Amino acid sequence: MTPKIVLTPEILSSREGVTNKLKDLYSTQIKLLSSKRDAKIPVVNHYVELLEQYEKQNEELHKLNPLDEGLSQESFIELLDNQLSVKVEELAKINSKLSFEDLSNLNAVYSDSIDRFFWDFHTNRITSTYTLKEYIDPEPLMKVHDARSIVEQSIQTTSQILSLNDYPVPKFEIDSIPLKVKCVAPHLIHIMFELFKNSTLPSISRKKPIIVRVTDEDGFVMFEIADRGGGMPDSSLDKIWQFHYTTSKISERDPIHGFGMGLPLCKVFADFNSGKLSMVNHEHFGVSVFLKIPRAFKD
């Protein structure tokens, strides 16, 4: 039997800290979702449907006293773990409700204020998830990694997911110098998966590899993902960073395409890791995407 965790002043203080942080994040999310209650936009309404869930989780935190020594650490972690289980399903819950008509309607009325709503929601969602995981798992999430290792893990993950979904797997070429990067590794792997996935079919159709370059740029690690798949029409460039913009028809959707969350969500993940994501399109030639993440100079 695992011995019961002894409540020390340090543990009680950390419980108070994480509880207060989560209450602030949930309150911000509740305010954000409440501001869109009267929206006449179906996609936004699907987000607003999560309001009750956030109110419930916020109430759970307000009802407990993290400094109460009668509340065991095991019970406290169980509560946070249950909240995490709900939180990681949010995006899937939203996507399961989206129709092609919903996405078309959103595209017709998309604006800066709608973009800001999505950006703030996903930033808060990712921060909440990170805060919960960081407390539950004693292993730090934000740490130093070898940059090339991140690329290789991303290629392996992409190849596995594409194969499992009956997609062809492209060839990759890595041009990397020894560099270390400080990041949440699953976030960078998610970003690279999305970028590799987008380049897969164009690269295969032209029998060209996806090239990944890793270079040093003024204290940052620059990951360049370049393909020679023909590029995109310049006319589509103003849409690609738009949340829920997709060119896929509802009948073409599969587990890895069709929800329009790839690039914009990657940008949120990059921002969370103090980085930036940008793109250069060469119409009729190919696309280069640049992911810039702070360099780590020591472990």
Pin down the residues of each PLM region:
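Signal-transmission coiled-coils
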Residues: 2-168
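Acidic ATP/Mg2+-coordinating residue in the GHKL
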Residues: 227
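Short helix-loop "hinge" at the ATP-lid/N-box region of the Bergerat-fold HATPase_c
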Residues: 198-203
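Short alpha-helical Gxxx[C/S/T] motif in the catalytic ATP-binding
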Residues: 262, 266
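Short beta-strand/loop element within the Bergerat-fold HATPase_c
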Residues: 207-219
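Glycine-rich ATP-binding loops of the HATPase_c
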Residues: 274-285
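Short conserved segment of the HATPase_c
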Residues: 232-248
